[in-house]
């Protein structure tokens, strides 16, 4: 049924899947996710997205940046969106690549689906990539990099949801997340301090029992206290596709042009290693369904 896109070495790597329900209009979510100035405000995976050109078929070429304290990872990408499909959905497909040896992500591809529901929509992404950073990236991808990217994608989706539903600016939800995390960290440090005193001080058995109970109670309350609804959480997202259709990339991904980069200093623009193969292992819809 579906067509698999990908390199042989990527076949064993599980694509990242994230889905969240959003109680907002399709137009609202489309604008917040497709506008290159708004997209990086909620998506932790990008610091800047700079469109460079668009062809006659609507395929958009862009550059992206991810700012680190001492380095900026740069890459290129192509994307194509379909706002109005015959089935009522909207979709967007993407291919990306980077020549940055410090990037943990190499060439890859993915998609977004906007699936209408009775009270809003399901916002879905699936993507896969070749690990970057050479042997180190290969070694760390499955256990560290890929789970971290999945978490970053999920918490970003919840930031988008809060923005679309409640007009809570992404920087404000980020600050609330840090406040929540800080408060929980203080609680755990306090609990650890109480438990440490139990073993470091000479006190009666009753006092030790009381301090132990207090320390354990503080730790449990800190861990179990529900997160406020305004604090973004990755746990509000699905991380496994509920059905086969959701996990399929739109068929337009197969025909999307690969991003192009400059081959060295002053070199000609050449197709990247993602040309005609995307480093993804994503099942796509049959042709003709976008």
Predicted regions and their residues:
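Hydrophobic pocket/interface hotspot
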Residues: 28-33, 39, 60-64, 94, ...
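Short structured motifs
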Residues: 15-16, 47-49, 63, 95-98, ...
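Membrane-interfacial hairpin junctions
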Residues: 197-209
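Surface-exposed, charged secondary-structure patches
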Residues: 55, 65-70
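A conserved amphipathic terminal alpha-helix motif
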Residues: 128-175, 182
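Hydrophobic ligand-binding cavity/cleft-lining segments
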Residues: 1-61, 184-199, 213, 217-290
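Beta-strand/loop substructures that line and gate deep hydrophobic ligand-binding cavities in soluble
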Residues: 6-10, 68-76, 83, 95-151, ...
């Amino acid at each position: 049924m579906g067509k698999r896109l990908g390199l042989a070495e990527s076949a064993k790597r599980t694509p990242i899947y994230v889905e969240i329900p959003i109680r907002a209009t399709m137009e609202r979510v489309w604008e917040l996710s497709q506008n290159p100035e708004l997209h990086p405000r909620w998506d932790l995976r990008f610091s800047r997205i700079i469109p460079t050109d668009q062809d006659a078929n609507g395929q958009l070429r862009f550059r992206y940046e991810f700012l680190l304290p001492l380095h900026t990872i740069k890459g290129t990408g192509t994307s194509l969106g379909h706002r109005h499909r015959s089935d009522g959905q909207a979709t967007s497909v993407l291919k990306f690549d980077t020549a940055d040896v410090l990037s943990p992500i190499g060439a890859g591809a993915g998609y977004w689906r906007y699936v209408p529901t009775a009270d809003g929509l399901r916002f879905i992404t699936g993507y896969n990539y070749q690990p970057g950073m050479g042997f180190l990236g290969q070694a760390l991808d499955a256990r560290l990099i890929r789970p971290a990217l999945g978490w970053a994608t999920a918490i970003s989706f919840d930031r988008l949801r809060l923005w679309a539903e409640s007009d809570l600016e992404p920087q404000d939800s980020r600050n609330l997340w840090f406040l929540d995390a800080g408060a929980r960290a203080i609680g755990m440090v306090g609990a650890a301090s109480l438990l440490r005193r139990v073993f470091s001080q000479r006190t009666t058995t009753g006092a030790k029992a009381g301090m132990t109970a207090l320390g354990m109670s503080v730790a449990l309350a800190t861990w179990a206290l529900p997160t406020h609804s305004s604090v973004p959480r990755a746990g509000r997202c699905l991380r496994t596709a509920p059905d086969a259709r959701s996990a399929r990339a739109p068929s337009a991904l197969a025909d999307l042009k690969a991003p192009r980069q400059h081959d060295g200093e002053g070199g000609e623009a050449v197709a990247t290693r993602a040309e005609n193969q995307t480093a993804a292992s994503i099942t796509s819809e049959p042709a003709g369904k976008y």
